[in-house]
Amino acid sequence: YGEGFYTFFMEVTRLSDSVDLLNITVSERLISNMDLSIGKEIIVLGQLRSYNKFVDGSNKLILTVFARNIEPCIEKSKNPNEIFLDGYICKEPVYRKTPFGREIADVLLAVNRAYNKSDYIPTIAWGRNSRFCQTLEVGDNIRVWGRLQSREYQKKISETEVVKKIAYEVSISKMERVTEESLNNEGHEDT
């Protein structure tokens, strides 16, 4: 379509002062007269997209925020990194306990969008939400609220070699299973 796209990384600081490094994709048309120099504070609204990229001999799932709007940040938000997803479980959730005793569940969500496309989004649930994930089955429709996070981890390549990698995932703070009943009740207030 003759439209160019740019990608860049954006740092978002959590309440804990940890920093998430988010991958942003934006049309040149959205940023033609903007100053996006390093250190500029901006607000990005968009959709989380995924695609496979062949890297180092294997496919890697890439997550990017496809920007719909970018504007200068005038006033900082208390919760600057929020996401909502409505999708379908496409792989059996994996529940486990970490070496520190935290309960977590990895859930892969397929989120449908226009033109018969889907984005596959890795998510992670904690505590009681991770236990709830044990009741979910492939094909279940769920809604999740949370934040997009980047997490550094060590991958063991051999007995002597370890490489540093970054995982991108949605950290779930609230979730619900979508049922016929919940769909029928939407938009109806109890009086």
Give the location of each predicted region.
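Single-stranded nucleic acid-binding surfaces, predominantly the OB-fold ssDNA-binding core
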Residues: 1-191
